[in-house]
Amino acid sequence: MIHRNLSEVQTRLVKFGIVCLGTVLIAVAPTPEGLSLAGKYTLATMFFAGSLWVTGTLPLPVTALSIPVLLTATGVYDDMDTALVGFADHLIFLFMAGFMLANALQKYDIDRRIALYTMAKMGSSPRRLIGAVMLSTAGLSMWVSNTATTAMMTPIAVGVLSQVLSSESVAAVGDSAPEGTASGTATDGGIGTADDFTNMQIGMLLGTAYAASIGGVGTIIGTPPNAVLVGQLNAILGYEIGFAEWLLIGLPVVFVTLPLVWYLLTYVLYPPQIDNVDEAQEQAQAYLDEEDSLDPRGRRVAIIFTATAGLWVLGGLGTFLSAYLPDVWMTTLFGGSGMTIFGLEGHQGILYYVMVGVMAIPALVLADTMEWDELVDIDWGTLLLFGGGIALADALADTGTTEWIANTVFSDLTGMPVVLIIATVVLVVVFLTEMTSNTATTTILAPILIGLGSVFAATLGLTEFKTAIFLSVSGAIAASFAFALPVATPPNAIVYGSGYIKQSHMLRTGVILNIVMTAVLTGLIWLLFTFVWPHLLW
């Protein structure tokens, strides 16, 4: 154990040394034409952080904390106060509120009840049962982190599978053939089915992971890449996508891709050859019956969550309500430069989605549902990663580095058809995400994709501003559609780590789905870009 740990430390130090050497070489090299000295140092910082993120040499949040240090040490920023501004970005507080709301849902098992209810009511056939698991997972993943959702749903799925296959037949990696189970049960059609793994098991568990990733696309707080993009658009372009606006981006993607992945898993790749799932449906109902009815505190959490989600959506409907509300109330509720009911001019709006989210935290405490030590038990590392990414995005924009990268690397690609541009962005993002986390990929690529606005504006027939939004949104969506390797997304890692899926199952299935989803996302994004987003987002 000591030798192995020593070897790991040595490997980490070697990787870190190589990254530092590359960073120094960029910093001391002659400044490229069209790039300022500050831009060169920012480029070196981007190389340093990006390399550490991709290689996993250091934990992602630790690398994020190094960004403001390097930016200040090299003189890109005069002081740490300026370099640390990204760590106080409003979206960090939105995600913090989302994490805390999710903690409250989990404390009272509200998320588990929703999942079990869906499975008990929908799971009348093998395919419908898998669909119920995927629908529950995707729906919860819009509001609870996809990591927490998958961690909760995986044991539920295994428990339900044990009733379908008999508990001895839920194969784990390394198991021999279950006693009394013919090996033929594992070869009931489909592709890549190992002897001990039935199609039902593979389809349900992979469906759980993939549904969590897809569902996260639906809302800003559903998955970190969404918030990373929104934060960097605000940092670089000063453009803000609200909670309701993101629903117009994410929900169509979820509504199209989730049923398609379910169909491919259950009809094409792993069609279940089991007729009767009554016991599984009964098991889901039994799990649900074991849950006591929600106590008053749990009901108050449900009310607060529902009210928060409703106000998030309502906050994006100001344009539609302007004809029915006095100007003073429009400014107070939805923001603007006019007079408010408080007698002051200019207001962000009480229904601003970050304000609504943050106010849910004291509401949980006042309702006597959560203690502070329960609220703060959240993923602070992800919040630090957001801060580092926004700090880097600010520096890339302030020094003109994103525009320089876009013009230098991608200028020869102008004139490509729109569909080919989208396909290239989606394919590159999916490929990179398979090698590193989707959060790290988005943090690295979002500033570059935003910078491509100046390169492809004429090709797309849009302004540079709109082109930057379009390309970067496409990339952020694609970051949630890497299905082949455990490292790509937290849901993939959790399902693989459960021991009930082999990496070969995920790899073969994921490669096929990656190819299909690249084509589907390309067409879907083009349709949204052509007929929806221009009328609703800009």
Describe the role of every protein-language-model region.
Residues 73-76, 86-169, 203, 207, ...:
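Hydrophobic or amphipathic alpha-helical targeting/insertion segments
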Residues 127-139, 166-215, 241-248, 418-431, ...:
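Alpha-helical transmembrane segments of multi-pass membrane proteins
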Residues 82-85, 113-123, 159-162, 166, ...:
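Short amphipathic alpha-helical coupling elements at transmembrane boundaries
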Residues 7, 97-106, 123-124, 135-149, ...:
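Helix-loop-helix module between adjacent transmembrane segments
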Residues 168-178, 182-275, 292-295, 491-525:
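Membrane-core helix-loop-helix motifs of multi-pass transport proteins
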